[in-house]
Structures are given as structure tokens and as C-alpha cells.
């Protein structure tokens, strides 16, 4: 076997080889299963050795960009970068800027479809080794959803276009983002489908007092202890009292009670006198809430124990989940209008989940992408833009 020239444009040439069989059979040219682009340097900083011109980074067959460039882009969008920004960086690093057809000068392009296609094809590949296989069997499972609003072009009003369901669990006592998925509503059917995607059952679930969510937890995890998030309960009570305050009749007593809500939720010592004062105010809607949902608060005080002795994986609220989902909210919010395909969005969320769990490593991504390509004769196992919405009806609207 010997070198037999190159193919491709200058700066991106790929090596051809000539096979000359010792048996006397006709010689033939070929390229590697994963062809290497020409190296731009004489040494590799990663493996700390000299490299030849033919020992550059690996690329998929019929792909202009190398596996490492794809991996870096996947990590970037998982960390919150937009498709456009990640695509611009990928083109600049790979020196793949398009030329202006008139002047011949390099033309900067921030079109995001390049990286969007990579997310569609390779996000499941890099996510698969880290995909949770079952729900955690210890600690608590924390559930919440992130609503994203977009402007309706017909009415001009903003509405919730979709929600991202998020779950956090504990692995070896450490918090871990367990699952993310986009849904168009937060109905019981959607929550049951989301929770039913994995086998097993956690011992304890913490969530909001939303009817669809609570009913789905009881249906899917009948043996789990259900604990309603104290932050959401307190926030619901504050909203109710805020509405009552606007009516003016009970403004003074509501102002007095509002200042004591946060302290009341610390435990039964302050909760009991707070409830007595609220009932004494003679406000029917407030008394009704305290006689129903307030009983849940009292019952949970007996289960949560003292803060000093409470294990870290037994929180009374979903607030530990906020550290994972707040960056996702910030990254998705400004571009929510453009996320209309549910499956593509879920593949983007795979990368965000890997980033949240600190599992997004360029070298690992490159290794997984190369293994996938090698197993499929140098090409991806799915075609680009195969994930589409039938009939031009957006699946995430």
C-alpha cells in the first residue's frame, strides 16, 4: 500500500491510497473509512507527537467538516450557544467560509442550519451512553416545568407555546438532571407519558400542587411518598392574598398577614398562630384555602423533620432543581419562537442535559461520533433533515 495523491480543495485535502496486491491482482485506489483531512500543523497538541500531512482530524465521508468540529459545536449549543453563533465559530475554525460569487471574497455566514442538522443527527449519538435507564431508587425525584411564551401573529397576544418538563434526582447523594422533554401542555396525559418513559419508581416525589402533575405521579408512582413543594404552596397563598388585597375591604389585615407568610412556612410553631389569625379575619376564600391546602402544609411539617437532621436528598421544595433549569430557561427563552419541531427540540435538550450534568466533553463526543460513523461505513446512521413535521403543522405549537 502506498500514497496515491489527494482529493479535495487546498487546505482540506484528503489522502488517497493505492493497494498493490502481492498476488498480482489489479491495483486499486481507495480512501480510509473515515478519511483524514490534511494536518495544518506538524504536531498534535492532544497526543503530543509529530504528525504527517495525512494524519489530520477524521471526517465523515461526504462531510466537509471533521468530527472534532462537530463535537465542539454540539458542546457549544448544549452550553447555551445559539445555532447561528455555533455555526459561525465552526466555519471560522474549519476555514470553511463561503466565497462571494461576485467578488470571490470570503463571506461570513451565520445561518444556523449547519449546526441544527448536526444536533439532529449526532445529539442522540453522544447522549446514548449517558441516558438514564430507570428512575432513581433512592432520595427524591423533583419535578417541574418551564413554560415558554411566544407572540401569536394572528391575535398579537403572547401565549404559552410549549413547556419543558424537567426532573432532578440523586445519584450517590449528588443531584443530577435526570430527564428533559418538551410538551405542548401540562395535562395529566402528557405528564404520564413523560414519567412512563423510564421503568422503576422513586421512594419520594416533590412537585407543584398542579392537578395534572399530582394525578400523574399518583398513577405512575403509587408507592412513592408525595410531597408538595413548599415554595409553590407559599407562592399560591401569596397570590391568593394579593388578589384579596386588591378588593380593598381586607387590605389592612392582608398587609399584616403577608409579612408573616415566609416565617409561617418554617414550621408548626409559627404556622399555627398564623392560621388562627387568618381565620379570625373572617375572609371566606382565605379560610377555605387554609382548611384544604393548608391542612396539607400542616401534615407535611410532621414528615419533613428538622433542617439540621434532614438528608440533602430529602428537600421540602423543588428549589434544588432551579440550579439546573435556570440556565436552560435563559438559553431557550430568547429563541422559543423558532423552536417548532418537538423532536429536534428534544435532541437539543439532550445536549443541555449533558452540559448540566457536566458530561459534555469534546474528546468523548469525538470518540462517540467516530464510533458511530465507523459502524455505518463512514456515514451517519440517519440522514440530515429526516426529522420533519408532516403537513407543515408545527409539533410544538
Q: How would you name each of these model-derived features?
A:
Residues 88-91, 131-138, 289, 302-306, ...:
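Short coil/turn segments at secondary-structure boundaries
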Residues 91-95, 120, 291, 295, ...:
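Short amphipathic alpha-helical surface patches that mediate protein-protein
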Residues 199-206, 211-361, 376-385:
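Extended amphipathic alpha-helical interaction segments
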Residues 359-397:
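A short, flexible helix-boundary coil/loop motif
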Amino acid at each position: 500500500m502506498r500514497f496515491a495523491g489527494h482529493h479535495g480543495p487546498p487546505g482540506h485535502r484528503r489522502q488517497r491510497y493505492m493497494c498493490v496486491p502481492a498476488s498480482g491482482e489489479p491495483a486499486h485506489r481507495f480512501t480510509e473509512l473515515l478519511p483524514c483531512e490534511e494536518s495544518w500543523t506538524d504536531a498534535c497538541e492532544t497526543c503530543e507527537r509529530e504528525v504527517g500531512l495525512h494524519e489530520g482530524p477524521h471526517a465523515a465521508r461526504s462531510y466537509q467538516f471533521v468530527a472534532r468540529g462537530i463535537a465542539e459545536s454540539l458542546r457549544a449549543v448544549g452550553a447555551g450557544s445559539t445555532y447561528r453563533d455555533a455555526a459561525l465559530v465552526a466555519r471560522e475554525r474549519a476555514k470553511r467560509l463561503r466565497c462571494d460569487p461576485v467578488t470571490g471574497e470570503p463571506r461570513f455566514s451565520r445561518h444556523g442550519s449547519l449546526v441544527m442538522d448536526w444536533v439532529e443527527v449526532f445529539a442522540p449519538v453522544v447522549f446514548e451512553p449517558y441516558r438514564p435507564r430507570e428512575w432513581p431508587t433512592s432520595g427524591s425525584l423533583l419535578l417541574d416545568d418551564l413554560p415558554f411564551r411566544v407572540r401569536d401573529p394572528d391575535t398579537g397576544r403572547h401565549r404559552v407555546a410549549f413547556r419543558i418538563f424537567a426532573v432532578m434526582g440523586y445519584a450517590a447523594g449528588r443531584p443530577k438532571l435526570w430527564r428533559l422533554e418538551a410538551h405542548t401542555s401540562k395535562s395529566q396525559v402528557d405528564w404520564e407519558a413523560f414519567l412512563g418513559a423510564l421503568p422503576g419508581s422513586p421512594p419520594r416525589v416533590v412537585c407543584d400542587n398542579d392537578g395534572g402533575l399530582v394525578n400523574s405521579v399518583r398513577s405512575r408512582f403509587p408507592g412513592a411518598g408525595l410531597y408538595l413543594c413548599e415554595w409553590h404552596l407559599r407562592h399560591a397563598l401569596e397570590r391568593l392574598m394579593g388578589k384579596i388585597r386588591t378588593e380593598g375591604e381586607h387590605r389592612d389585615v392582608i398587609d399584616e398577614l403577608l409579612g408573616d407568610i415566609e416565617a409561617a412556612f418554617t414550621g408548626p410553631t409559627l404556622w399555627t398562630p398564623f392560621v388562627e389569625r387568618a381565620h379570625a379575619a373572617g375572609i371566606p376564600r382565605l379560610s377555605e384555602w387554609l382548611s384544604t391546602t393548608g391542612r396539607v402544609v400542616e401534615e407535611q411539617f410532621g414528615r419533613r423533620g428538622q433542617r439540621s437532621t434532614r438528608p440533602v436528598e430529602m428537600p421540602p421544595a423543588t428549589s434544588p432543581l432551579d440550579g439546573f433549569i435556570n440556565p436552560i430557561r435563559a438559553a431557550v427563552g430568547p429563541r422559543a419562537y423558532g423552536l417548532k419541531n418537538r423532536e429536534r427540540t428534544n435532541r437539543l435538550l439532550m445536549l443541555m442535559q449533558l452540559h448540566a450534568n457536566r458530561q459534555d466533553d469534546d474528546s468523548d463526543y469525538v470518540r462517540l461520533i467516530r464510533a458511530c460513523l465507523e459502524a455505518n461505513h463512514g456515514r451517519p446512521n440517519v440522514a440530515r433533515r429526516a426529522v420533519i413535521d408532516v403537513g407543515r403543522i408545527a409539533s410544538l405549537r
